[in-house]
Amino acid sequence: MTATRGLEGVVATTSSVSSIIDDTLTYVGYDIDDLTENASFEEIIYLLWHLRLPNKKELEELKQQLAKEAAVPQEIIEHFKSYSLENVHPMAALRTAISLLGLLDSEADTMNPEANYRKAIRLQAKVPGLVAAFSRIRKGLEPVEPREDYGIAENFLYTLNGEEPSPIEVEAFNKALILHADHELNASTFTARVCVATLSDIYSGITAAIGALKGPLHGGANEGVMKMLTEIGEVENAEPYIRAKLEKKEKIMGFGHRVYKHGDPRAKHLKEMSKRLTNLTGESKWYEMSIRIEDIVTSEKKLPPNVDFYSASVYHSLGIDHDLFTPIFAVSRMSGWLAHILEQYDNNRLIRPRADYTGPDKQKFVPIEERA
């Protein structure tokens, strides 16, 4: 046996949820460009879970189901309030909150398709509120109740900031949610499928996925981009800062991709929203810095920006704390994780790969008295 490190290029399963072929991302056969410009996030949720777009009645029913389950349980609010959250990683808080949701759900270990779908609704509905509640509680603020007349994008911004978002803010966040909803068999999605393939429950699968996303090699790149932009500070500092990093052969966050060789198709949508939002907020320097960095890196390294690069300035312009960027990734990717979990349950086989052993061979046991 010969191992493929990182499983790069290994086809591990079949899936009908999303695909990446020739640098084109599709959800259930629909091009990401088409969906981003025309769909709501709720339509994407339905598409990923049912493998088809909803009609008006089906979409309205899904929205009502999500609205009904959107409130954060008081037990989790009290849990957040019982800790000093100053040094708590938001992803650790979210991971723990998902486990608590499982404890509070009487159907947690009921494994039939109908119960699993109901749990998927609860998880998708509650996760935005969990992130918003954590953010407010650690600032000494009370959580804001979600509005039944708002969709997920509107409600998240409303419950996070405590004020009605503008139409352009809702548009930007809706697009960001769609663009991050699924991405074939990435690390966290694969983790979720491995977990539930043992016939563990859906909450365990999502908790495992969040644990994988917490790692900086998967989630967190856009937070790194915003840290870089903050360090640069002004547009005129961008070129010397980036060239100094390139001379030292240091990594520039937000460029290149493991799968896309000629450019991430999601990046251009966030680039446009970054331009519009930063102009709206009067902080166009974030966009202008990003443009300057992109010009240098693509020229010098031949690396195009990925989805993380412009999402940083988009989220910053929406008033989102930088350490919440990865939890927001989870808010969106929840739809994809749940789609893959439901798909795994529907046609399950335990995932059990092999390892190429590289350790010593044919050793003889030595009594402890005789060991050096």
UniProtKB/Swiss-Prot annotation:
Superkingdom in the source lineage: Bacteria
UniProt keyword annotations, A-Z: Allosteric enzyme, Phosphoprotein, Transferase, Tricarboxylic acid cycle
Xref: PROSITE patterns: CITRATE_SYNTHASE (PS00480)
Stored Pfam families: Citrate_synt
Keyword Transferase belongs to the record: yes
Pathway participation: Carbohydrate metabolism; tricarboxylic acid cycle; isocitrate from oxaloacetate: step 1/2
Keyword NADP recorded: no
Catalysed transformations (reactions): oxaloacetate + acetyl-CoA + H2O = citrate + CoA + H(+)
A GO CC annotation given for this chain: cytoplasm
EC number(s) given by UniProt: 2.3.3.16
GO MF terms held by the record: citrate (Si)-synthase activity
EC top class named in words: transferase
Stretches that traverse the bilayer: none
GO BP annotations listed: carbohydrate metabolic process; tricarboxylic acid cycle
Phosphoserine modification, residue list: 284
Conditions for induction: By decoyinine and nutrient depletion.
Role noted for this protein: Might regulate the synthesis and function of enzymes involved in later enzymatic steps of Krebs cycle. Loss in activity results in sporulation defect.
Sequence similarity: Belongs to the citrate synthase family.
Subunit structure: Homodimer.
Other remarks on this protein: Citrate synthase is found in nearly all cells capable of oxidative metabolism.
Identification of the protein by name: Citrate synthase 2
Lineage summary: Bacteria, Bacillati, Bacillota, Bacilli, Bacillales
